[in-house]
């Protein structure tokens, strides 16, 4: 019951589902999505990982690998009575075969990846902490 097409959540993925009252904060859904993307961009930049936005309907974030962009962060939301439900998921080291069985967010499964598959060095705990800090700057 969220926006976006079919997705998959599983082990090796960080799923963040905050409940935010946008009406109270006087923000719209686009502002919120932009904020989620910016939080991730800043947190990953603090870990020397550059994320990219794509200019299309399919929101989320990509990393570059061999001159190709691979999606590692997905955003899917539900807006009801001023409240945002659901949120985002980040592919750290999950089994990507699960995406072969679906049409993930309307993309071809070859466009989906994880930090592990792309052999990007990362410290999961540090990224978690940096995401938390960036989230707190924006929403608290």
Predicted regions and their residues:
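Catalytic beta-strand/loop module used to bind and position nucleotide/cofactor moieties
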Residues: 1-3, 8-11, 18-140
């Amino acid at each position: 019951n969220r926006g976006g097409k079919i997705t998959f959540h599983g082990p090796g993925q960080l799923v963040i589902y905050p409940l935010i009252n946008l009406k109270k904060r006087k923000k719209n859904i686009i502002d919120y999505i932009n904020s989620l993307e910016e939080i991730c961009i800043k947190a990953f930049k603090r870990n020397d990982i550059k994320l990219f936005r794509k200019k299309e309907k399919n929101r989320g974030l990509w990393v570059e690998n061999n001159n190709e962009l691979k999606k590692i962060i997905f955003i899917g939301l539900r807006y009801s009575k001023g409240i945002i439900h659901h949120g985002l998921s980040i592919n750290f080291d999950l089994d990507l075969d699960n995406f072969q069985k679906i049409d993930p967010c309307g993309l071809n499964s070859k466009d989906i990846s994880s930090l592990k598959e792309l052999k990007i060095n990362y410290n999961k705990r540090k990224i978690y902490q940096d995401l938390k800090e960036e989230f707190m700057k924006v929403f608290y």
